[in-house]
Design a protein with these regions (language model features):
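N-terminal Rossmann NAD(P)H-binding glycine-rich loop of SDR-like oxidoreductase domains
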Residues: 4-24
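NAD(P)H-binding glycine-rich loop region in Rossmannoid oxidoreductase-like domains
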Residues: 46-88, 92, 96-99, 113-114
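A conserved pocket-lining segment of Rossmann-fold NAD(P)-dependent short-chain dehydrogenase/reductase
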Residues: 74, 179-199, 203, 207-211, ...
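Short alpha-helix in the Rossmann-fold core of NAD(P)-dependent oxidoreductases
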Residues: 83-90, 106, 138-139, 197
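Conserved Rossmann-fold NAD(P)-dependent oxidoreductase catalytic core, especially the SDR/UDP-sugar
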Residues: 91-134, 150
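Active-site Tyr-X1-5-Lys
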Residues: 130-158
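Flexible, glycine-rich beta-alpha linker
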Residues: 155-175
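Mid/C-terminal beta-alpha module of Rossmann-like enzyme folds, strongest
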Residues: 214-242
Length: 242
């Protein structure tokens, strides 16, 4: 059975990925700031520590989910934090993966890496629009660097750009919105005609597992959605009905 390394294992997607990998009987290791029950855990804080080289020993596939997404524009040093976590750590982890002959490196990027969406136009992987915001810019920079580096090594790189992810244990704005609706303080949203793509966390996990098993994904970027579009009003009504 293949040995898997997961970063960001305690995050929203990471928790679901770990559950699926356990069910399928994979040998799992995680890099995390805290011990994960039932998982071989290498303790590391990417913001403070170098990546422990022993974390990559005997690993076949890396799922790199860890990233920095907090939009705290006025926080001192915030740009350096984005650069270190989203770019430097990603490149360093791929370098160590190549050194240890890891077969596949799968990077979870973001739809924001493809640039700001154009109303009424379906985004494509080949789009080269300028990403808006430091989060999208650093994710795009990481993509370009690891694709180039991967082509020069024996470690194949695949990149996933998920749309807004929803599902059990969701965090961030969707979590706050659900809490507000349940407690009665979130106001009804009008229909404005805005549209956005989304994807269920289980579908993201299935996409990751497919990238790991299909060689056609080598050195490629993939945008994933659930195939539908939602307005803010749609999301509000769905949450009210659950």
């Amino acid at each position: 059975m293949q040995k898997i390394l997961v970063t960001g294992a305690t995050g929203f997607v990471g928790q679901h990925l770990i559950e699926y990998l356990k069910l399928d009987g994979y040998n799992i290791r995680a890099i995390s700031r805290k011990l994960i029950p039932g998982v071989d855990t290498v303790i590391c804080d990417f913001l403070e520590d170098d990546i422990p080289e022993n974390a990559l020993k005997d690993i076949d596939i890396v799922f790199h989910l860890a990233g920095y997404a907090h939009d705290l524009k006025n926080e001192p040093g915030i740009e350096q934090t984005y650069q270190k976590i989203n770019v430097n750590v990603t490149v360093d982890l791929l370098s160590l993966s190549a050194k240890h002959n890891v077969k596949k490196f799968i990077f979870v990027s973001s739809a924001k890496a493809g640039g700001s969406p154009v109303r009424g136009v379906c985004a494509a992987e080949k789009d080269q629009n300028d990403p808006a915001g430091i989060y999208g810019k650093t994710k795009r920079e990481a993509e370009l660097k690891i694709l180039e580096k991967g082509r020069k090594s024996s470690t194949h790189v695949s990149i996933l750009r998920p749309a807004l992810i929803y599902g059990p244990k969701v965090k961030g704005n969707l979590q706050l919105m659900m809490q507000g609706i349940k407690k009665g303080w979130f106001p009804p949203l009008p229909e404005t005609g805005n549209q956005r793509s989304m994807i269920h966390v289980d579908d993201v996990v299935q996409a990751l597992l497919l990238l790991a098993s299909d060689q056609r994904s080598n050195d490629e970027i993939f945008i994933v959605t659930d195939g539908k579009t939602y307005s803010s009003r749609d999301i509000y009504e769905i949450m009210c009905s659950t």
